[in-house]
Every structure is written in C-alpha cells, then in structure tokens.
Amino acid sequence: MKDTVMTYLLENSIKFKGKPNPKAAMGKILGENPDLRSKVKEVNQVISEVLKEIETMSLEEQQAKLDELAPEGLGQKTERKRKEIELKNVKGNVVMRFAPNPSGPLHIGHARASVLNDFFSKKYNGKLVLRLEDTDAKRVLPEAYEMIQEDLKWLGVKVDEVIVQSERLETYYEYGRKLIEMGHAYVCDCDADEFRTLREQGLPCKCRDTTPEENIALWEKMLAGELDNVAVRLKTDIAHKNPSIRDFPIFRIERTPHPKNGTKYHVYPLMNLSVTVDDHLLGMTHVLRGKDHIVNTEKQEYIYNYFGWEIPEYVHYGILKIEGPVLSTSKMHAGILSGEYSGWDDARLGTLRALRKRGIRPEALYKLMVEIGIKQADVRFAWENLYAANKDIIDKDARRFFFVESPKKLVISGAENRKIDLRMHPDRSELGNRELLFDGEIYVSDDLEAGKMYRLMELFNIVVEKVENDIIYAKYDSDDFKVAKTNKASIIHWIPVKDSIPVTVIDENAEKIEGFAEKDFAVVKEDDFVQFERFGFVRIDEKLDNKYTCYLTHK
C-alpha cells in the first residue's frame, strides 16, 4: 500500500510544485483503487507517513522517485509515454530476435524482452526470430526447447523463425577459422590464472604472437579432439580500460555431452562469437538488450569491425527489478528435483507458467511490459499494476460467490428459513442469479464474540450468545440494516452448511486455504475465473469428485 500511496502523492506534489494536496490525492487513490475503499483509516495513516518523507525531497528527487515507482506513469502521462515507444533508425524491413537460453521455461524477466521485440516487429511489419542459445551443454534442459515456444505462444508473441545455435556449429567454425586466418584470433593454452594475471597488468600472453599458420594447425587439432584446456581468443586492445575486454575468449573445449549433439562436437563458441555471427547472418537491424550487456556490445563490435559488417542498432534498457518470486532457473530446477516446488508452475515461482496457473492473463502482462518500455533507467516491477491490468480483463466475466475460509459453524435460533437471490455479477444480469437457502445452520470465517451484534451479508442481524465446542450459537435480532449500523455491527459473509462445496485455494506462497463455497459454485468449469467476495479473484484449476482446487489470482 505504501508504494501506491507514495505514487499518487508524488504525482500530486509535482503537479503543485512540491506542495502536495493530501485530500485530492486521497480521492484519486480511492477512486482508482476500489480495494482500498474499505481501508480508509489505514490509507490516511499511510498518507501521513508518506507526506513526511516527501517533505524532505526536492522536486527533482520527487520526480526521480515517481519514475522509479511508476515508470509507465499515471493518467495522461501514461498515454504520452506509450506514444513515445519507438525504434530509432528504422529503414526498410525490421528484423529482431528474442534469444533465451533453454535452461528452463520463461519467467517474468524474459517477458520484457520477448514482448518488446514482438511489439516492435509487429509495429514495423518486421520479422521476429526466436534464437535458442544452447551452446553451453551444462545449462541446457532438454524439455525447455518446447516449453519456451509454448510460453511465447501463450504470451501472444509471434515467432517467424526458430534458430537453434547447437545446430549451427559448423557455421561458427567457419567464421572462427576466418578470424584466425586474418590474424584477429589465436589459440591460447595458457593457464587460466596465469592469463588473468597478465590481463590485469595489460600484458600479452606467450600465445598472442603465434602466426596464423601455427594457430590454424592448433585449431584443426582442437576440432579433431586432440587438445584440452585451450581456448581461442579474439585479439582486442590488450591495454583496454576494461580488463574483461582484453583478448576475451570466443571458443572453448567442452566435453560435456550435449542434449542435441551428444559427443559429436567438443569445440563450442562462446556467446559473443555466436551472437555476432548470427545477428549478422540473420540480418538483425535492431537488438534490444539490458544495459548489463553494454560490455558485450563493445566486445561484439570488434568482430563486426574485423569482418567489415554493418553494426545493428543497439538499444540498452534498464534493469527490471522484480521482488517476490524465485527467478533463478537453477534454483527453481533444484527445488523441483528436491520436491520443494511442485513443478515449473508452482505459485511461488516467477515463471510464466506459474502466472498462468494463478490466473494472470497474457494480455495484462504484455500490456505492462509495453508500458515499462525501453527506457535506460532501472525499473521496479509493480505487481499492483499487473494485478490492476489483469482485473480489468477478468472482472467483467468473473461471477461472484461467497467463500468461507477456515469455516466455523454458526447455529442461529429464532429465524425463519429464507431464500436469498443474488446476482452472479453486479453489472451483468445476463449471467443469472445465485440462490442461498438459510435454514438455521451456516458457516462463517470470523471468530465471533459472545454478546456482540453482527450483520449477515444480504440477510439479517444476529447477536452471539455463546461459543461452545467450536460451534457458535446466536439468536436472530432484526432485519433492519440501520440497527446494525447503529450498533456498529461487523458485516460478515456466510454460506449454508447444507449443500456447501469444499474448496481449496492455493495462494501465491503455495499455502493451502481450506473452506467452503455456496452450492451454485458448482456451475463453474476448470479455467474459469470467479471472485470470492471479500476474498479475491481465483482461477478454477481442478474439480475432483465434488471438491474444487483454485488458485488465488489477486485481491
């Protein structure tokens, strides 16, 4: 909540030259965030705390903080920023690529790169290549080849061509050989620690001055499997200010069997060689990548220049800071193997499969990634913005039901049996009605106190008499809502014990919440979305016998 309040107050403060109007901000916060309307007191408290922080900031600091919290902006600012997302130097056909490593399925971080490349290739009627960068056998998960393509299809990313790097090794060998023949690369058998020491001092190793002829002979031995512990290095500036750019490696020996090639090959290109060759041969016009790849861009430009190739337009965007779910593929895989996680779609993970399982619609994620865009500033991934976009999509079709978690039996005396008809959706009468039958015994979620009055939602007022053996006993008081209001009675939802349906809801922490839903919940099908009133939106995952398993999507 604090980030949401901070965002609105900062926007308001900047609008009024550093003098925020908390009342105006409060109105906008509640107007655009219906879930906070029941928490006015708490929101007011947070506003007071946030105002103290804002008062210590200059206007420039306020703008910087707002850009961090809401990079896509609010209101009209959002529309303006959306119009600004475009590529520079677009000439003719645009060719772009999304290039993941097949070490597992895609996660939220991948979504940004895949969506932006798809967005621009569609915007400019271009072509999008999916390039699976699988030249490191140790990092390849065989099933990931298909999983990645399935994830992209779900996300709405249209792939025009699929390239698998492990199927192109002979092509990389061809260009590696050319670099050696031109004197731009050499085979190095120096000990790694020895080379590192020389590199840090800006000194060449003993292998750097060997002739192209000698290096070609060594290259042939590498390909024949006669050498180990050697690498091919690209000649750069040995005195470059960045030591990592000094004669970086472009080929290595790898004896680990490859999932696709087995042991047929044992010389594999490193990323900067294979990426450069592919980007050139596939005709990439624009390359989108994180600013953490700026050094790699400089490395790759050496190869472009040695071959006299045209360098594509590089766009380096800021880091997407994602808090919450696990994103490390190796940690996820290890957790799955150990049984800690149920699979790649475990609710605690940051995979697209996990988001899909929880009920996040691909259109919502796509929209948010386009709004985040390609700015160079680092960006915080705002879960609340994803949930808001998702709610806009699913709300209109989500039927409403009562759900009682951790149910407690409540027996009410003095009330006649009743039938309550409620709409399935407050704004869509065509979705029909649902029926609640009161017969004296109901389930509630709340711990009720003896002597207090409560209002049963859409029903009547009761007064609790006692709690005995985990059963709550109460008596009917009145129908009049004004009586409940006068007595400051809490309003609680309920369901009849009779015909109640057992439901398990799995939340974002993979915790199971057990409870009951009303009888008309039985009309839902797997993959439907519903809103459990005063609980949240859920996706129906499975029906087994008469029990349902759902995933909590968001509030």
Swiss-Prot record:
<keyword id="KW-0963">Cytoplasm</keyword>
<dbReference type="GO" id="GO:0032991">
    <property type="term" value="C:protein-containing complex"/>
</dbReference>
<dbReference type="GO" id="GO:0004818">
    <property type="term" value="F:glutamate-tRNA ligase activity"/>
</dbReference>
<dbReference type="InterPro" id="IPR000924">
    <property type="entry name" value="Glu/Gln-tRNA-synth"/>
</dbReference>
<keyword id="KW-0436">Ligase</keyword>
<dbReference type="InterPro" id="IPR020059">
    <property type="entry name" value="Glu/Gln-tRNA-synth_Ib_codon-bd"/>
</dbReference>
<dbReference type="InterPro" id="IPR014729">
    <property type="entry name" value="Rossmann-like_a/b/a_fold"/>
</dbReference>
<keyword id="KW-0030">Aminoacyl-tRNA synthetase</keyword>
<dbReference type="InterPro" id="IPR011035">
    <property type="entry name" value="Ribosomal_bL25/Gln-tRNA_synth"/>
</dbReference>
<comment type="similarity">
    <text>Belongs to the class-I aminoacyl-tRNA synthetase family. Glutamate--tRNA ligase type 2 subfamily.</text>
</comment>
<dbReference type="InterPro" id="IPR001412">
    <property type="entry name" value="aa-tRNA-synth_I_CS"/>
</dbReference>
<protein>
    <recommendedName>
        <fullName>Glutamate--tRNA ligase</fullName>
        <ecNumber>6.1.1.17</ecNumber>
    </recommendedName>
</protein>
<dbReference type="Pfam" id="PF03950">
    <property type="entry name" value="tRNA-synt_1c_C"/>
</dbReference>
<keyword id="KW-0547">Nucleotide-binding</keyword>
<dbReference type="InterPro" id="IPR004526">
    <property type="entry name" value="Glu-tRNA-synth_arc/euk"/>
</dbReference>
<dbReference type="InterPro" id="IPR050132">
    <property type="entry name" value="Gln/Glu-tRNA_Ligase"/>
</dbReference>
<dbReference type="GO" id="GO:0006424">
    <property type="term" value="P:glutamyl-tRNA aminoacylation"/>
</dbReference>
<dbReference type="Pfam" id="PF20974">
    <property type="entry name" value="tRNA-synt_1c_C2"/>
</dbReference>
<feature type="short sequence motif" description="'HIGH' region">
    <location>
        <begin position="100"/>
        <end position="110"/>
    </location>
</feature>
<dbReference type="GO" id="GO:0005829">
    <property type="term" value="C:cytosol"/>
</dbReference>
<dbReference type="InterPro" id="IPR020056">
    <property type="entry name" value="Rbsml_bL25/Gln-tRNA_synth_N"/>
</dbReference>
<dbReference type="InterPro" id="IPR020058">
    <property type="entry name" value="Glu/Gln-tRNA-synth_Ib_cat-dom"/>
</dbReference>
<comment type="function">
    <text>Catalyzes the attachment of glutamate to tRNA(Glu) in a two-step reaction: glutamate is first activated by ATP to form Glu-AMP and then transferred to the acceptor end of tRNA(Glu).</text>
</comment>
<dbReference type="Pfam" id="PF00749">
    <property type="entry name" value="tRNA-synt_1c"/>
</dbReference>
<keyword id="KW-0648">Protein biosynthesis</keyword>
<keyword id="KW-0067">ATP-binding</keyword>
<dbReference type="GO" id="GO:0005524">
    <property type="term" value="F:ATP binding"/>
</dbReference>
<dbReference type="InterPro" id="IPR049437">
    <property type="entry name" value="tRNA-synt_1c_C2"/>
</dbReference>
<dbReference type="GO" id="GO:0043604">
    <property type="term" value="P:amide biosynthetic process"/>
</dbReference>
